[in-house]
Amino acid sequence: MALAGWLSACQPQTENKNPMQMKVDRFVEVELTTDLGHLSAKEKQMLPLLLETAQLMDDIFWTQAYGDKEALLASVDDEATRAFIHLNYGPWERLNNNTPFIPGVGPKPAGANFYPADMSDEEFEAFKAIDKTSLYTLVRRNEAGELQTVPYSVAYREEHQKAAELLRKAAMLAEYEPLKNYLNLRAEALLSDNYLASDLAWMDMRENKIDFVVGPIENYEDARYNYKAAHEAYLLIKDLEWSQRLDRFTALLPQLQQGLPVSEAYKAEQPGSDSDMGVYDAIFYAGDCNAGSKTIAINLPNDPVVHLEKGSRKLQLKNAMRYKFDHILIPIAEKLIASDQQTHISFDAFFENTMFHEVAHGLGIKNTINNKGTVRDAHRDLYSTIEENKADILGLQMVRQLVEMGELEEGALMDNYVTFMAGIFRSVRFGASSAHGKSNMLSFYFFEEEGAFSRDAETGRYRVDFEKMQAAVDKLARRILTLQGDGDYDGAQALLAEKGFIREALQADLDRINASGIPVDIRFKQGAGVLGLK
């Protein structure tokens, strides 16, 4: 870390830099690594096999996102442009509305490379194939120019067969039976396009030190119809200590539910804790998850059949969070948080806020108390934003309860409050149009109204008032839980219309951050060499 800082200090001044290099430099490079000392000899032998499998997923994703990677790289002659192509998996800038950054390249097709570029919506509508909307088929033209589907197991036969072979070799080394079973079933899934059995097997893993998310999973890359799954892989090493702490907090959910600052009717439901949560360090990202900004938490599988039968698993990627905290959140806090409160910006608080947000989704109420059906149905298009806000605020409320229960250190609560404020600036610096962005603005302006923080007009810095913040968290928790329990759509709409957007004064502060050269995100130096496996 220190070396990276020293090197950047020796770089030529910004005005002398290649504009493309400036784009690359907005993503700070970090080494993706962790301590592998607690792995057994056989577990260490599995890693190169899984890394090779992940690289195959990366190769496939390139063809899905763009097409011919090597031809594209060969068409440019400067290293900075090549690096930016690698980062974006193509010639379009992902964090800038997919704007082309190479002369002569047209707009990115909304359906990426999953469909023929010249296919119209009407043609797709008229196309009668029953598997045209499958997650695991490409749409192509046959020799007569007509649309046809091609299953992934056929389109990527060579890569899938090689990946299946590697997964089976890794399974032979696995000492933990559920991991062995999962790897074998995932190998079969790549050859059959049927992922259900392997998704269910993945849910059965609890004691594994190595986890491997692999295959066609998320459908965001298909921005045209959201039908097609893109290939990716995460190779993860479990953080045993933090995972155990999280298990303990999850076990306390019934007590935490009873401690919510609302009347009995709004907390009568049993909190959901069926889903498994774990803490991991990532040691390799491949394909979809490595394109553009980097994920710091995973919630899988996506299959609703698995949700009904076994729930889902939430994986917090601690080292990726740490890199974002060190390189993005800390520099933002240095610019916007009162100097004497910067000691309250801590990684533990950042990590707790993120994790308790996830745990807090299980608290509160899922069904209205006045026969309006589920909260989701009653709040319709506003549900995600209000639910995100509930998770943020009840997460902070949980920290206070856990301190009072003796589960967390006394005095840490101020760290959580000040770090939460800095986290708002980090998450909305490029806009607040997402559900989570609107939720952050709702919290920000509610807290401002309650005097939970103040802004020094002279320095442009923010200061948290501990007592008022405690009161404001309880008050907002009451408001949100009541809106949910009453199924009050109009009330939720009015609250968001008033507070769910960035106002001018805050925008000016965000502009100040963005003009100061603080990184947009991280990029990884990763692989066997970085891990000391070569």
Regions found by a protein language model. Name each.
Residues 396-492:
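Long, well-structured alpha-helical subdomains associated
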Residues 7-9:
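C-terminal motif of bacterial Sec signal peptides marking the signal peptidase cleavage site
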Residues 1-4:
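Sec-dependent N-terminal signal peptides
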Residues 20-32, 37-49, 130-377, 381-385, ...:
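Fold-level signature of zinc-dependent metallopeptidase catalytic domains
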Residues 477-534:
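Extended, compositionally biased alpha-helical segments that mediate assembly or anchoring
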Residues 62-146:
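N-terminal accessory alpha/beta regions
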